[in-house]
């Protein structure tokens, strides 16, 4: 028996490995794998069903068909194990070996491997330096190639057609060798001397001038070096021996009725064997050349089809006209090996059923149907029954369970006690899609689900199904209980806010409970405590909404951290006093002393979690739910048609709007306004009408007048059911009520433009046929959008997960002093996100000082929590430098301090947390809520009116940021710089508002002056761009020739004439050379210099500029010399929603990107060419940088203006690549974070910035080498930044020259494919290309990410698997240590020993 066990043990031992290498297989290697050559195309005998000898299923080669039984039946049973039968030649062993024994085919002529030939760039082509076209012509026997030119005029690897070959033969005889087919390519590949070629190219590289040639040589050099380093030989890309897959991996299954189901591979192998055998026969017969050639070509084609069907020519089809599935198809795509079997497997001990509500469950419970539980827990039940002695054998136990006797249910109850099960709802978009619960047995067939976890699962009870999984091992049960239990997942990982929040009925019930009603039954009564209030309510003395006075006892923490009761009489309502009974002690009463809608309840739970801990919060949440359901029932809020009250004002508003529209129509008919203007105005009118109606409706619905106790009328919130549902946040919104009781408003056409005639009716009045027809389009589009959106959103999530999957918290602190500077996010004067929300849960990078002093408020490396946020606000700190994922210096992974708080748990993040996947899920999960379409903007639907002034909202002090200005004659400031911003600072020194002010704005206040709320402090003309003079003097025209560079226009109404500069393109030859400008001179005619410089005041005028001055006119400082009309900003389609997020993460370059200044210096314009402007920037060092810019771009800069590197010089959307190159890592991170957040914010989705930063970090992990220094990198090579940093540290330690690099940004798809792990990349996309590249380079996968480890079937190096990997790494280091013991000093050894002992004691291994 022992022997047997030993034998079985050694069967499945896998070597303990640390990496996987992929390479090319040499013919000898293939033969060494093989157990014999397959000579016949036969599979099995159709009569006996036994495999044919030497065929594709041959038992002699691949192993026996039955366990321990040879084919002819001479040897059976275990005792003959290992014997080889002399009759049929089959080894007596397990039939399992048919899964791993390979065979081979000896090919009669060599064949090229299609992957290395056709997968672009063609590896064979690169090595031989021939085009793919030529190689294919040689391989498929269309032309000859010279392999040995000898003493002739021919070149090596020259292509010869049939005629040229014959001519050459006549001329040179057998001086030279030329071959065709794979033999020729094989000969050429064998002749390559890798080391020689590499050395030669390394020498040539520095001398090469042309960029394209250099790139080509670099590519070829990289490939050659890869071959040399990996030990692969180029000739192995041509095969002499073809391996054959083990037969059980390409099965042949007899169906009933004498037919067979077979894997496509067998067909493909049969073709290869047939052609190979035919070719052998032809070669033996010495057949004519042309026949042999044809047969060789067919062999090549059949091997191509076997390896990758359809890559070349038409795919080979089977009997059913479908292309056969080749080896390459087996591994790629969603149905391939990687995604179908390795990354996603089916599991046993699982069941699924419909879900229904379990309103009586506790949060940690779920209802499990008895039938299901019995089936799922069978093995446990059998075990228990045997242990109890109720059954003697498993068979008996089985019978008992099938009878379902009483004792079985008792045992089942015991078995499931405290044995958590996991519930999962597809689609699992984030980690809360699988949670653990304790099962409670129920009758019926539906799983009962606790209502509060529905938000996390995104589940509802309209027929959703869920799956149940049973964790079997004790470790699995422990993890399920400690990590996955629903009670441990109160906060959402995406934003750290509670996700266990009531919704719908519960909210409505609590809202109803905590509302007040004027003059309710029992108003004005006094009560001693909340229990007495409930008594009064139950006996019917007071109603729920009555306003009363009660003594309320709160518990407050004192200085020692003890709870102290504080009692006082409060004005409140009966319902709120009842609500107070379920609140745990330690909550402030103010939190529930208001009508509880969805937001206040969320705040309540959040407060409880942060201040009272997890256990209290969970119990409180359950109580809230029970209470909410109960009072929702009592309230009986239902909707009747009378609840939709149509406002009286609606009809007058509609009539007025109709009159206005008629007026505009009349103007249009007279030709006073254009069709476009009419359209926009009409749409504006109806939009505002709609707003007015809905405002009137809401005012009407939300308030009602009632008589109070004193007989006077008093206003109170309405008890209208529809209003209560919307106001509490239970269901519905103002927009939906508007359609029910206001007017439906404007509708969109199929192309997205808005129809001028609105739907004036609402649903209560009913729609006419035409109105109904107009509105159907939008409704259907919504459904179509949803379907597309789901797929797109899922694909985005998949890409995000793939790029971030290997990012794990690996150490506690990387010690960096870099970080991001956080300020409040301010848009158009509103604080969109205050500072506290941006720094909450982050770690301070440098000491935070109290503003205006040197006193330290927060020391470095402090984690900012809610309490510290209050401290920051009290001390009015307005910016903090915090640690960030982007600037973390850990090489592979990230440190806890740079990440900060674990949002789902509320404390510092633990080591081993898989933050990459969490980030990807947090960004991807709300993807389905984003819109799909790009917004076509029509009318006022959302067209921003051109802004022309700044009006402040807060009182404070005006501060100008990076602004240059002059003071004009009226003592106003005029801005003369491009990217100026104006901020309002409150008395605490905090920034409250921020506005962009364009060039030429006139300010009514000076820098540092006090402003009051409502002041207009800046004005400008939005439709023209002025040219402002910075000095006073007389205007002198330069190059302004009437009819050449300018024309005069006279305004018909005013009679004023103005000069318009003609566009350069429309001038004649002399005019093209002239550059019209305005020069300022003093009274004597001398040039005036710009203040403080030696630059004369000369202002160039671009085409279309309008000058309202005459030659010699006097101007003062800050006056406008000319105006450049701005084309009215066309309503650009803003790409919104999902496509925008995808564009940002894919780092796509926008269509017409903004042009940024490449260098810092002074701008000048050089000679213009056709269609382009030459821009010169003179740097402080005196160097001149020049760049050509298309004339179509409107430049924001004028001659002589200083610019800073990275400043915008032509407007447009900025390209992230430019921002990274010119401004650095932090600005590009900020840009992407803010742009992505903007999309999510529009939909009201909250995501923490950290998650987006994680993805950005993964996008900038590669860099391009600018100067290799003493490193082994090549110039222009793309390498992981971490690799360069490691190598640079080593080089610096040796005192050598480190490599210089420039950060590169890659889109997420590209970054995923460029990861160091080829297994991860291959399982993502483009499997063939990734594997081809990896094989040629002989890459080794170190199995560092999560995906690679899942694929090879290990614990992942994150979460609870993190320690396992740490331990393995430690053991490995320990195993390697003795090799270098000669250099260890005694002290070191002693220290190491103590460390080891201590760590053992700490980890409890004693």
Curated annotation (Swiss-Prot):
Gene3D superfamilies: 1.10.132.30, 1.10.150.390, 1.10.1790.20, 1.10.40.90, 2.40.40.20, 2.40.50.100, RNA polymerase II, clamp domain, RNA polymerase Rpb1, domain 3. Mg(2+) binds at residues 460, 462, 464. Its EC number is 2.7.7.6. It is an enzyme of class 2 (transferase). Its cofactor is Mg(2+); Zn(2+). It holds the Pfam family RNA_pol_Rpb1_1. Zn(2+) 2 binds at residues 814, 888, 895, 898. The keyword Signal does not apply. GO terms for cellular component: DNA-directed RNA polymerase complex. Keywords: DNA-directed RNA polymerase, Magnesium, Metal-binding, Nucleotidyltransferase, Transcription, Transferase, Zinc. GO terms for biological process: DNA-templated transcription. CDD domains: RNAP_beta'_C, RNAP_beta'_N. InterPro entries: DNA-dir_RpoC_beta_prime, DNA-dir_RpoC_beta_prime_bact, RNA_pol_asu, RNA_pol_N, RNA_pol_Rpb1_1, RNA_pol_Rpb1_3, RNA_pol_Rpb1_3_sf, RNA_pol_Rpb1_4. Binds 1 Mg(2+) ion per subunit. Zn(2+) 1 binds at residues 70, 72, 85, 88. It catalyses: RNA(n) + a ribonucleoside 5'-triphosphate = RNA(n+1) + diphosphate. GO terms for molecular function: DNA binding; DNA-directed RNA polymerase activity; magnesium ion binding; zinc ion binding. SUPFAM superfamilies: beta and beta-prime subunits of DNA dependent RNA-polymerase (SSF64484). DNA-dependent RNA polymerase catalyzes the transcription of DNA into RNA using the four ribonucleoside triphosphates as substrates. The RNAP catalytic core consists of 2 alpha, 1 beta, 1 beta' and 1 omega subunit. When a sigma factor is associated with the core the holoenzyme is formed, which can initiate transcription. Belongs to the RNA polymerase beta' chain family. This is DNA-directed RNA polymerase subunit beta'. The gene is rpoC.
């Amino acid at each position: 028996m022992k022997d047997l066990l030993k034998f079985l043990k050694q069967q499945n031992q896998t070597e303990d490995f640390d990496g996987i290498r992929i390479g090319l297989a040499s013919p000898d290697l293939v033969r060494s794998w093989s157990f014999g050559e397959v000579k016949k195309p036969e599979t099995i005998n159709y009569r006996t069903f036994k495999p044919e000898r030497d065929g594709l299923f041959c038992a002699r080669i691949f192993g026996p068909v039955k366990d321990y039984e040879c084919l002819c039946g001479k040897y059976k049973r275990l005792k003959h194990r290992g014997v080889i039968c002399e009759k049929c030649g089959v080894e007596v062993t397990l039939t399992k070996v048919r899964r791993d024994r390979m065979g081979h085919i000896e090919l009669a002529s060599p064949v090229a491997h299609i992957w290395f030939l056709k997968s672009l760039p063609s590896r064979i082509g690169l090595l031989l330096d021939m085009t793919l076209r030529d190689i294919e012509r040689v391989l498929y026997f269309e032309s000859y190639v010279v392999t040995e030119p000898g003493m002739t005029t021919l070149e090596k690897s020259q292509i010869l057609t049939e005629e040229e070959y014959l001519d050459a033969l006549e001329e040179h005889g057998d001086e030279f060798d030329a071959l065709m087919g794979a033999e020729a390519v094989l000969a050429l590949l064998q002749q390559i001397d890798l080391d020689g070629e590499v050395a030669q190219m390394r020498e040539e590289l520095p001398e090469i001038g042309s960029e394209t040639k250099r790139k080509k040589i670099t590519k070829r050099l990289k490939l050659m070096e890869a071959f040399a380093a990996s030990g692969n030989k180029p000739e192995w890309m041509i095969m002499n021996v073809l391996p054959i897959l083990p037969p059980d991996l390409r099965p042949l299954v007899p169906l009933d009725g004498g037919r067979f189901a077979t894997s496509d591979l067998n067909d493909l192998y049969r073709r290869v064997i047939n052609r190979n055998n035919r070719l052998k026969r032809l070669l033996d017969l010495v057949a004519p050349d042309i026949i042999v050639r044809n047969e060789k070509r067919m062999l090549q084609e059949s091997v191509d089809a076997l390896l990758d069907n359809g890559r070349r020519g038409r795919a080979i089809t089977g009997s059913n006209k479908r292309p056969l599935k080749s080896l390459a198809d087996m591994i790629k795509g969603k149905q391939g090996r990687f995604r179908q079997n390795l990354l996603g497997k089916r599991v046993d001990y699982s069941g699924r059923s419909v879900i229904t509500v379990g309103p009586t469950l506790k949060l940690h419970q779920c209802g499990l149907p008895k039938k299901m539980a019995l089936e799922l827990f069978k093995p446990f039940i059998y075990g228990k029954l045997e242990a109890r002695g109720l059954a003697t054998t498993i068979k008996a136990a089985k019978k008992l369970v099938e009878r379902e006797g009483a004792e079985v249910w008792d045992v089942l109850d015991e078995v499931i006690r405290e044995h958590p099960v996991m519930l999962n709802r597809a689609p699992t978009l984030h980690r809360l899609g699988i949670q653990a619960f304790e099962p409670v047995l129920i009758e019926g067939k539906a799983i009962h689900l606790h209502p509060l976890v529905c938000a996390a699962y995104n589940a509802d009870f309209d027929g959703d199904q869920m799956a149940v999984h049973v964790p079997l091992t004790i470790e699995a049960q422990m993890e399920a209980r400690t990590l996955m239990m629903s009670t441990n997942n109160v906060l959402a990982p995406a934003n750290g806010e509670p996700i266990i929040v009531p919704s719908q009925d519960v909210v409505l019930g609590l809202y109803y409970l905590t509302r007040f009603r004027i003059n309710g039954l029992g108003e004005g009564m006094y009560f001693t405590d909340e229990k007495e209030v409930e008594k009064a309510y139950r006996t019917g003395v007071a109603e729920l909404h009555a306003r009363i006075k009660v003594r309320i006892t709160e518990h407050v923490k004192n200085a020692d951290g003890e709870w102290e009761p504080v009692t006082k009489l409060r004005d409140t309502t009966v319902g709120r006093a009842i609500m107070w009974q379920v609140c745990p002690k330690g909550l402030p009463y103010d939190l529930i002393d208001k009508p509880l809608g969805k937001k206040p309840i969320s705040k309540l739970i959040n407060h409880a979690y942060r201040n009272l801990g997890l256990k209290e919060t969970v119990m409180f949440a359950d109580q809230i739910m029970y209470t909410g359901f109960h009072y929702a029932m009592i309230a009986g809020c239902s909707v009747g048609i009378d609840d939709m009250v149509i406002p009286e004002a609606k009809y007058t508003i509609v009539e007025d709007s109709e009159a206005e529209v008629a007026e505009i129509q009349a103007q249009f008919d007279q030709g006073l306004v254009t069709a476009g203007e009419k359209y926009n105005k009409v749409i504006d009118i109806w939009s505002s009408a709609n707003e007015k109606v809905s405002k009137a409706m809401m005012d009407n619905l939300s308030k009602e007048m009632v008589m109070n106790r004193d007989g006077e009328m008093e206003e109170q919130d309405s008890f209208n059911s529809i209003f209560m549902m919307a106001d509490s946040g239970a269901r519905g919104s103002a927009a939906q009520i508007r359609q029910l009781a206001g007017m439906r408003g404007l509708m969109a056409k199929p192309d997205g433009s808005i129809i001028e005639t609105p739907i004036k009716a609402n649903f209560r009045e009913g729609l006419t046929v035409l109105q109904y027809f107009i509105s159907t389009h939008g409704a259907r589009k919504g459904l179509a959008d949803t379907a597309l959106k789901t797929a797109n959103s899922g694909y985005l999530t998949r890409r995000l997960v793939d790029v971030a999957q290997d990012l794990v918290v690996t150490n506690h602190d990387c010690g960096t002093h870099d970080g991001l500077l956080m300020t409040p996010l301010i848009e158009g004067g509103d604080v969109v996100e205050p500072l506290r929300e941006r720094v909450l849960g982050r770690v301070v990078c440098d000491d935070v000082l109290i503003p205006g002093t040197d006193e330290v408020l927060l020391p470095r490396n402090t984690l900012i929590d809610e309490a510290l946020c209050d401290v920051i606000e009290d001390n009015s700190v307005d910016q903090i430098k915090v640690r960030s994922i982007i600037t973390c210096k850990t090489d592979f992974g990230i440190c806890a301090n740079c990440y900060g708080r674990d949002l789902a748990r509320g404390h510092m993040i633990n080591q081993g947390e898989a933050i990459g996947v969490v980030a990807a899920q947090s960004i991807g999960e709300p993807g389905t809520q984003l819109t799909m379409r790009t917004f076509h903007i029509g009318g006022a639907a959302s067209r921003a009116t051109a802004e022309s002034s700044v009006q402040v909202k807060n009182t404070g002090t005006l501060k100008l940021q990076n602004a240059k200005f002059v003071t004009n004659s009226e003592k106003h400031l005029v801005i003369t710089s491009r990217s100026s911003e104006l901020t309002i600072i409150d008395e605490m020194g905090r920034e409250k508002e921020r506005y962009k002010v364009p060039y030429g704005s006139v300010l009514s206040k000076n820098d540092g002056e006090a402003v009051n709320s409502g002041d207009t402090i800046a004005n400008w003309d939005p439709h023209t761009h002025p040219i402002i003079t910075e000095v006073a003097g007389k205007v002198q025209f330069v190059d302004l020739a009437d009819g050449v560079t300018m024309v005069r226009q006279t305004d018909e109404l005013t009679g004023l004439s103005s000069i318009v500069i003609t566009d350069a393109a429309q001038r004649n030859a002399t005019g093209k050379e002239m550059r019209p400008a305005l020069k300022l001179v003093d009274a004597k005619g001398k040039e005036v210099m710009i203040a403080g410089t030696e630059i004369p005041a000369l202002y160039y005028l671009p085409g279309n500029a309008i000058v309202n001055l005459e030659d010699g006119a006097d101007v003062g400082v800050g006056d406008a010399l000319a105006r450049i009309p701005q084309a009215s900003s066309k309503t650009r389609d803003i790409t919104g929603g999902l496509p925008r997020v995808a564009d940002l993460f894919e780092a796509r370059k926008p269509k017409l990107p903004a042009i940024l200044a490449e260098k810092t210096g002074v701008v000048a314009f050089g000679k213009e060419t056709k269609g382009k402007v030459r821009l010169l920037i003179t740097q402080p060092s005196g160097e001149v940088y020049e760049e050509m810019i298309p004339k179509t771009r409107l430049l924001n800069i004028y001659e002589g203006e200083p610019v800073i590197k990275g400043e915008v010089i032509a407007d447009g959307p900025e390209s992230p690549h430019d921002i990274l190159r010119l401004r650095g890592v932090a600005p590009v991170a900020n840009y992407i974070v803010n742009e992505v957040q903007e999309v999510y914010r529009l939909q009201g989705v909250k995501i923490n910035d950290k998650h987006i930063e994680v993805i950005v970090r993964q996008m900038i992990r590669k860099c391009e080498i600018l100067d290799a220094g003493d490193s082994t990198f090549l110039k222009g090579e793309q390498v992981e930044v971490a690799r360069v940093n490691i190598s640079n540290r080593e080089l610096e330690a040796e005192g050598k020259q480190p490599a210089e690099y420039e950060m590169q940004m890659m889109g997420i798809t590209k970054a995923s494919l460029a990861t160091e792990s080829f297994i991860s990349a291959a399982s993502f996309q483009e499997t063939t290309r990734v594997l081809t590249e990896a094989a040629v380079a002989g890459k080794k996968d170190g199995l560092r990410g999560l995906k690679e480890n899942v694929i090879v079937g290990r614990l992942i190096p994150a979460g609870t698997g993190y320690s396992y990997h740490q331990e393995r790494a430690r053991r490995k280091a320990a195993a390697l240590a003795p090799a270098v013991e000669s250099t260890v000093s005694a002290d070191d050894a002693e220290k190491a020993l103590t460390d080891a002992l201590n760590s053992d004691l700490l980890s409890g291994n004693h």
